[in-house]
Each structure stands twice: as C-alpha cells, then as structure tokens.
Amino acid sequence: MERFDELLRGMDLEFFGRGSHKISIEKALDLHSRGEAFILDIRSEKENRLISLGFAASIPANEIPDRLEEIPHGVTIAILCTSSVRASVVYAYMLLKGYEKARVMAEGLKDIAGTIKPGYVRKYKMKPKEDLK
C-alpha cells in the first residue's frame, strides 16, 4: 500500500497537466505498427464479443493479475476500455507492477471506432490479433 501512496502523491496538477499518462489512438496504432506498443483492451469478455478490436489483445481488467505474463515489458502498453475509468485503475496497477510505459488511451471506444477508417487501416498496416502473441 505504501507504493500506491507514493504513486498517488506523484499524481498532482503538474502530472495530469503534462498528459504523459495518456496516449492517443493514432500514436498507439503508429507505435503498434512498428512493434513498439501493445494495445490492451480491458473490457469484459461479453463486451469484447459485442465489439471486438482486431488490433488489441483482450484481457479483462479483473483478469490482469492472473494474466500479467501475457503483457510484454519494454514497449508502450496502451490501455483501452469503453471510457477511461477502468483503464485508469489498470494503469495505476501496471505502473506498480513495473510497466513504466503504461498509458491510458485518451479516446473512448466511440472515438476509437470513428478513427479507424480504410485509409487509416491501410496506412498503419494494423496487425491482427494472431500476430500479437
């Protein structure tokens, strides 16, 4: 709990003002296309069945502690969910677990879907889920 206290103390106005805890969908997909990011969809399995994102690895938030070994170190971890509430919780958890490049996806699912259009997909050559492992 002491580590969480320290983490929280560092999240002051300056921290949030810099925005370094966030990443845009455009930046995340750019890094992902170069193998420099792991896009982590933390929505529930049921939510993922309704709307699946082929470029993201799906690990529900409540399963993260048991599946942490599936998440690589050394690359940016772009955490996404329907909004940023769950992503923010997982972000803090990931930082405490040593994932210094964890980031919260700035956009919600609605905005992400609006970004991914044919020209965008072609430009960034998104990798399908099978290539994420």
Where are these regions (language model features)?
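Rhodanese-like catalytic fold shared by cysteine-dependent sulfurtransferases
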Residues: M1-F38, E45-T76, V85-K133
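Short, surface-exposed ligand- or partner-binding patches at beta-edge/loop junctions that are enriched
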Residues: I79-L80
